[in-house]
From Swiss-Prot:
Coiled-coil blocks: none
One Pfam assignment: CKS
Superkingdom per UniProt: Eukaryota
PANTHER family per UniProt: CYCLIN-DEPENDENT KINASES REGULATORY SUBUNIT/60S RIBOSOME SUBUNIT BIOGENESIS PROTEIN NIP7
GO biological process: cell division
Subunit text: Forms a homohexamer that can probably bind six kinase subunits.
Similarity-based family: Belongs to the CKS family.
Tagged with keyword Chloroplast: no
GO molecular function, one term: cyclin-dependent protein serine/threonine kinase regulator activity
Keywords, comma-separated and alphabetical: Cell cycle, Cell division
Protein name per Swiss-Prot or TrEMBL: Cyclin-dependent kinases regulatory subunit
Keyword Cell cycle recorded: yes
Length: 76
């Protein structure tokens, strides 16, 4: 498994959340569960590295190698 091949998008925002998507290489994408969204422990175990607080909130069914994450925007 090569975590170096994982692509992390820039963050994008709305009023409530910041978002990012993560694109996995095919060998790692095979390890993504098909029946549920992943917990932080699960996505870390397949090599995804990002700061704490990100939630795997949606699947993009046509492209299961793309993981969609969000986290609550905190007041400044």
């Amino acid at each position: 498994m090569s975590a170096r091949q994982i692509y992390y998008s820039d963050k994008y925002f709305d009023e409530d959340f910041e978002y990012r998507h993560v694109m996995l290489p095919k060998d790692i994408a095979k390890m993504v569960p098909k029946n549920h969204l992943m917990s932080e422990a699960e996505w870390r175990s397949i090599g995804v590295q990002q700061s704490h607080g990100w939630i795997h909130y949606m699947k993009h069914e046509p492209e299961p190698h793309i993981l969609l994450f969000r986290r609550k925007v905190t007041g400044q």
